[in-house]
């Protein structure tokens, strides 16, 4: 049914008593990833990319190109350079097409205030207002303009010869690995068959075929001859499942790896590297399922000395993910005991000094400095493909926890001083506190006229009487149960269940033997 347009006088009308607060579970969470646009990142893209290896490096560079227009060209070029070390021809073609489209889209629209070399680098159109030519500078400009694009063209132009060569090599290697696996199966050597499946899966992974790689890694399970082989198979499946973002599969194989006899019975020191890898994978899966407190505990259990798997996650990621989730969900005691006083996680925080300062300032109740530092690292977090969809939620939880901790010792608080402490306006702060009161996180009332927040005074006398009555009822119930048990023991009364045949008999026998009588009285119940 078509919607009729509103009259011009009613389009800007606002109904009275309208509360300007968005519903908490609207489509904002589902579309958050699509709305991310990062304008001012402060990361060194080369250093960032070198923390990872394999497909995860390509995925992260592609994500940077998606959300950050400033780094898009550089990220795509780095991804193209790296993908040429693999057999992933399809991804090379996709990346090159995106780079070509990006360059074609940027060339006709140079910045309005660009001048000098930037203006000369853009391809002039027939309608462009060109200044008078500088005859003396033309030979130099032409030489520079011819030399620089030549190098760039050689490095990032579409290489059809490389595509054909890689496709042929990939096909030959696949045929060889497949024939080797058939020979191993004909010889019925389990260890060789297991290795053959792993080699075939590694090749599929290099070609970017994640589905077939997952199938081959999973098939190796039937040919594992030791617990170590089972754990290795589980780790491979977990790795590919993370690439596919199948988090339920990740958690399932983490449980299988932890229940392997050799891993469960072995010492924690002997399996420290595998344990750390499983904890990081579990933390990543719980983070994506928005179980932030569980994710924080998994990341905090990681061992810094054994955290070396760039094909999945970096040590800096462990610090950032674990630190932010802990800030958003831990109380002061947990934050002190599990994060600040943790000798293991302290090594992770050394890699992220800004995050370390944020945690310490939050614990010291310096909320203005803490929130300012959080805003400074926000853009860098938004270029991380795993934490970016959760940044808004985590920041909101951290801010709400800071408000709760700030107000908890007081019976009343001046909202003007609170607004100064949180770098906010009084109106915005009042809306935040109102939402916390509605959610039941703060027991308080707002004096909107004087801008004062009053804590609700609980009647200690009534609450004490209520607790006393509840405890009295519990004691009475326990006492009656004890008296009944003592009477049954004194009368030699006990209940014997009858074996059920075919599931039709649900009865039991109550045997009562009084005194020294040898005859038992049976009653059917």
From Swiss-Prot:
Pfam families, per the entry: CSN1_C, PCI, RPN7
Annotated PCI domain residues: 298-460
Gene Ontology CC, one term: COP9 signalosome
GO biological process entries: female germ-line stem cell population maintenance; germ cell development; germarium-derived cystoblast division; male germ-line cyst encapsulation; protein stabilization
Localization (cell): Cytoplasm; Nucleus
Record keywords: Cytoplasm, Developmental protein, Differentiation, Nucleus, Oogenesis, Signalosome
Keyword Cytoplasm among UniProt keywords: yes
Source species, domain of life: Eukaryota
Assembly and oligomerization: Component of the CSN complex, probably composed of CSN1b, alien/CSN2, CSN3, CSN4, CSN5, CSN6, CSN7 and CSN8.
Function text: Essential component of the COP9 signalosome complex (CSN), a complex involved in various cellular and developmental processes. The CSN complex is an essential regulator of the ubiquitin (Ubl) conjugation pathway by mediating the deneddylation of the cullin subunits of the SCF-type E3 ligase complexes, leading to decrease the Ubl ligase activity of SCF. The CSN complex plays an essential role in oogenesis and embryogenesis and is required for proper photoreceptor R cell differentiation and promote lamina glial cell migration or axon targeting.
Gene this chain is encoded by: CSN1b
The family this protein is said to belong to: Belongs to the CSN1 family.
Name used for this protein in its record: COP9 signalosome complex subunit 1b
């Amino acid at each position: 049914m078509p919607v009729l347009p509103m009259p011009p006088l009613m389009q800007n009308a606002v109904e009275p008593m309208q509360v300007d607060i968005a519903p908490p579970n609207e489509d904002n969470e589902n579309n958050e990833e699509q709305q991310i646009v990062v304008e001012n990142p402060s990361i060194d893209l080369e250093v960032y990319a070198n923390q990872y290896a394999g497909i995860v490096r390509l995925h992260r560079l592609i994500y940077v190109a998606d959300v950050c227009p400033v780094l898009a060209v550089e990220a795509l070029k780095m991804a193209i350079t790296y993908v040429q070390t693999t057999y992933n021809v399809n991804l090379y073609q996709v990346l090159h097409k995106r780079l070509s489209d990006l360059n074609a889209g940027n060339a006709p629209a140079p910045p309005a205030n660009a001048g000098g070399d930037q203006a000369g680098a853009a391809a002039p159109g027939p309608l462009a207002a060109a200044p008078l030519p500088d005859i003396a500078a033309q030979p130099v400009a032409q030489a520079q303009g011819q030399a620089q694009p030549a190098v760039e063209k050689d490095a990032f132009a579409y290489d059809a010869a490389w595509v054909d060569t890689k496709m042929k090599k990939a096909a030959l290697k696949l045929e060889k690995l497949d024939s080797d696996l058939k020979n191993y199966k004909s010889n019925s050597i389990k260890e060789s068959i297991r290795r053959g499946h792993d080699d075939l899966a590694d090749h599929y992974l290099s070609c970017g075929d994640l589905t077939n790689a997952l199938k081959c890694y999973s098939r190796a399970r039937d040919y594992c001859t030791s617990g170590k082989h089972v754990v290795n198979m589980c780790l491979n499946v977990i790795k590919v499942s993370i690439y596919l973002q199948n988090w339920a599969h990740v958690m399932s194989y983490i449980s299988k790896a932890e229940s392997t006899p050799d891993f469960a019975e072995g010492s924690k020191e002997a399996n420290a590297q595998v344990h750390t890898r499983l904890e990081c994978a579990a933390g990543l899966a719980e983070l994506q399922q928005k179980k932030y407190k569980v994710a924080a505990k998994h990341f905090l259990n990681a061992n810094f000395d054994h955290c070396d798997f760039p094909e999945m996650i970096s040590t800096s990621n462990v610090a950032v993910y674990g630190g932010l989730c802990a800030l958003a969900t831990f109380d002061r005691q947990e934050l002190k005991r599990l994060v600040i006083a943790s000798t293991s996680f302290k090594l992770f925080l050394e890699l992220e000094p800004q995050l370390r300062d944020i945690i310490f300032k939050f614990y010291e109740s310096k909320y203005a400095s803490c929130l300012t530092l959080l805003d400074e690292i926000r853009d860098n977090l938004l270029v991380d493909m795993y934490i970016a969809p959760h940044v808004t939620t985590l920041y909101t939880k951290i801010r709400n926890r800071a408000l709760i901790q700030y107000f908890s010792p007081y019976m009343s608080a001046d909202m003007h001083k609170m607004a100064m402490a949180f770098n906010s306006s009084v109106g915005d702060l009042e809306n935040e506190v109102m939402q916390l009161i509605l959610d039941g996180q703060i027991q308080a009332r707002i004096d909107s006229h004087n801008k004062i927040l009053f804590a609700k005074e609980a009647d200690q006398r009534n609450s004490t009487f209520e607790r006393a009555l509840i405890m009295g009822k519990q004691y009475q119930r326990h006492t009656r149960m004890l008296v009944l048990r003592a009477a049954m023991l004194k009368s030699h009364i006990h209940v014997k269940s009858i074996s059920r045949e075919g599931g039709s008999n649900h009865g039991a026998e109550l045997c009562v033997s009084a005194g020294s009588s040898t005859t038992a009285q049976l009653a059917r119940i």
